[in-house]
């Protein structure tokens, strides 16, 4: 089925919402970390148990009579994986083992009761729902909102929670210039590290005389211990794809490339699936939603060279050349991919775009700080009690991240230092724990 216009998209979205409804939704973490810990077998076992029960059918991405078992993206609480979330109760089961599946099935799926021993406990307190757990309570999950809550391998789950509403609004209610102005007014800054104003970059590309332009996504996440972009690509690929589509509409580009390192095989597979499904229903390709806007998206696998995270080296790699940074100017906005004007942003930056277009620049500026609005995803790793993927408002302090979200240092040891920003970052000591996390 090809969606030909805005009305058909709205009707299809409603259909997807109906298909996603179920008396009980079981979301087994299908992120790389949990899969490595055995969540794939847990998923298959829960599926098998549900099938064996009379009157309950399990099929990924299809309408189900009573119970839906889905393989989601990363839930974020990697220290406690494998994770299983049960809705509508919002129970989050931690460190689930294969032998726990029958008890989960009998007690929770059939009986609605929590399996107490699988719930998170801290300092003598048991937290039944995911939202109450301190690790999640202080986060503001916007970019990661759907990760762990939707079937990452089926477009229906993404559409049911609002995917492609931003590009729909842009195509039917906004001019390309208005889209760029909205992103500029929001003061969204690049989440790849440099913090350059995204709207300004788009303005520079749109102002070029050359009419052939490209949109490129930098998914070459090379910093040791970083897995923010990987988790977005694995858990909510349509959000990033939609952001690229909006950028393409804004600068009048018709072709885009996602550059992903080959060490992210699951992210690549889920991106392939997402692109294929979007093409199948007409959300990618020619004359999207019956408009004059066409956009084709490709995936390019990187070989893992750290230097290819730099813009000019990345575009050279896509072209089949050696990934080496070049002298600037010209910059990628002037001569990027194949010497054409190119919008180049990272995964998290694009993932912010649909929300800004849908909700407006003022909404986005109401989060974070005036100079660094919005949120930022971080990979919290090392000698803390709760490692994982977090998303916090800009302006939060290091102390809040490490102690309120991370739970402090393991075994109550003394804090020594925190390394931030990968190889290009640095180390901060105890007297800097109240430093705010922002670009300035």
What are these regions (language model features)?
Residues 49-50, 243-247, 395-410:
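Short amphipathic, charge-patterned alpha-helical segments
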Residues 268-394, 406:
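Hydrophobic alpha-helical positions that pack around
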